[in-house]
Swiss-Prot record:
Alphabetized NCBIfam families for the sequence: L12 (TIGR00855)
GO MF annotations, alphabetized: mRNA binding; structural constituent of ribosome
UniProt gene name: rplL
Protein name: Large ribosomal subunit protein bL12
Gene Ontology biological-process annotations: translation
HAMAP family for the chain: Ribosomal_bL12 (MF_00368)
Homology family: Belongs to the bacterial ribosomal protein bL12 family.
Length: 124
C-alpha cells in the first residue's frame, strides 16, 4: 500500500474513527500528537499572561455511572460515537474522560445529558 493510498483511506474516516486511530498510534509508538511548544522571542510578564489566560477547553469526566448504568452507556455512545463494547468499557472504567478539548457550552450540555441519565460527572 502506497502512502497516497493510505492518506486516501485515512481521509475517509469519521472524526471518531480518526481520534481512535491517533490514540492507537500514540499508544503503539509511545508518542504524543500534541504540538511542540515553540519558545517565544520576547516573553511577556507573568502577571499579564495570568490575567489574559482563561480556560477555553474543557474535559467532561464520567466519575461514576450511578444506578442506571444502561442509560449512561446509551448516552456515552451517542456523545462519543463509540460502539457498545467500547462505551461499556468506558463506563465500567470510571472515572474516565468522555470528551476532551471541547467548548464550555458543549461540556455543560454533555454533563447535563450524563447527569440526566444518572451519572456522576465532573467538568474540568
Amino acid at each position: 500500500m502506497s502512502i497516497e493510498n493510505l492518506v486516501e483511506e485515512i481521509g475517509k474516516l469519521t472524526l471518531t474513527e480518526a481520534a481512535a486511530l491517533v490514540k492507537a498510534l500514540e499508544e503503539k509508538f509511545g508518542v504524543s500528537a500534541a504540538p511542540v511548544a515553540v519558545a517565544a522571542g520576547v516573553a511577556a510578564p507573568a502577571g499579564d499572561v495570568a490575567a489574559v489566560e482563561e480556560q477555553t477547553e474543557f474535559t467532561v469526566v464520567l466519575v461514576a455511572a450511578g444506578e442506571s448504568k444502561i442509560n449512561v452507556i446509551k448516552v456515552v455512545r451517542s456523545i462519543t460515537g463509540l460502539g457498545l463494547k467500547e462505551a461499556k468499557d468506558l463506563v465500567d472504567g470510571a472515572p474516565k474522560n468522555v470528551k476532551e478539548a471541547i467548548s464550555k457550552d458543549e461540556a455543560e450540555k454533555i454533563a447535563k445529558e450524563l447527569k440526566d441519565a444518572g451519572a456522576s460527572v465532573e467538568v474540568k
